[in-house]
């Protein structure tokens, strides 16, 4: 107890202690970019985008899809597919133990969630990586769920949207994991042959085998602001080439400037913007856009030189 607290009457000390205990844990959080203290419910309403600086924080797969798709009519694809330890792999820990830990921590069976639903009334199939599940790494289950989602989109002739957030292929599955790069790419080739649109949304981070396969195969490739996108990480590249990388290297803005992606879209505008784009690509009428971002929010047009073309 501090000297100031000792001088306080006991009743005041008790009241202050009770007020402190009445504040729920996790009610406040801190922005890792601008260090602003944020009210957690407000941050959740803002889709995990800092209302002070616009930093796009990482968000879980189900929360992302819930904010992207219409609330009604969502049907999960491939929920029955479960991972197995076919190689009985072990590094510092058994693979099956890592799976159990990730499943307990996230509530997911693996690192990809696939949903069939509607986007502003338009039928779509959407998939999202769960980065909290072993770094969103792509193994057999991720590949199988993605292929099922792509096949569903192809059979029903509805657009496919993928939100990538992955460190790459899952090393614990060896060649089974690497094969998913070819497997998912082949599924997207079949989708393309049928003329069904595929939009790839790159979020922070999209790296390794995922960036080298499905993530870059979209008819439209967009990214969230500030997303780290590449194959090897910047530290690995610097150690290999022994040179200092340019500022912002591998960030979404750098890739847009150099023509590697098509647009940068604010997460809060993602559903409306992609709905309008997909309506144009599928020759459907677009529903009215939702309200514009509130004052102080950063619209994506500031980093989107081709936005007018798609709008």
UniProtKB/Swiss-Prot annotation:
Binds 1 zinc ion per subunit. One of its GO terms (molecular function) is acetyl-CoA carboxylase activity. InterPro entries: AcCoA_carboxyl_beta, Acetyl_CoA_COase_Trfase_b_su, ClpP/crotonase-like_dom_sf, COA_CT_N, Znf-ACC. Pathway: Lipid metabolism; malonyl-CoA biosynthesis; malonyl-CoA from acetyl-CoA: step 1/1. Residues 286-299 have a biased composition (Low complexity). It catalyses: N(6)-carboxybiotinyl-L-lysyl-[protein] + acetyl-CoA = N(6)-biotinyl-L-lysyl-[protein] + malonyl-CoA. It is found in: Cytoplasm. Its cofactor is Zn(2+). A zinc finger (C4-type) spans 31-53. The keyword Cytoplasm applies. Its main location: cytoplasm. Keywords: ATP-binding, Cytoplasm, Fatty acid biosynthesis, Fatty acid metabolism, Lipid biosynthesis, Lipid metabolism, Metal-binding, Nucleotide-binding, Transferase, Zinc, Zinc-finger. Residues 286-311 are annotated as: Disordered. One of its GO terms (cellular component) is acetate CoA-transferase complex. PANTHER family: ACETYL-COENZYME A CARBOXYLASE CARBOXYL TRANSFERASE SUBUNIT BETA, CHLOROPLASTIC (PTHR42995:SF5). NCBIfam families: accD (TIGR00515). Belongs to the AccD/PCCB family. This is Acetyl-coenzyme A carboxylase carboxyl transferase subunit beta. The gene is accD.
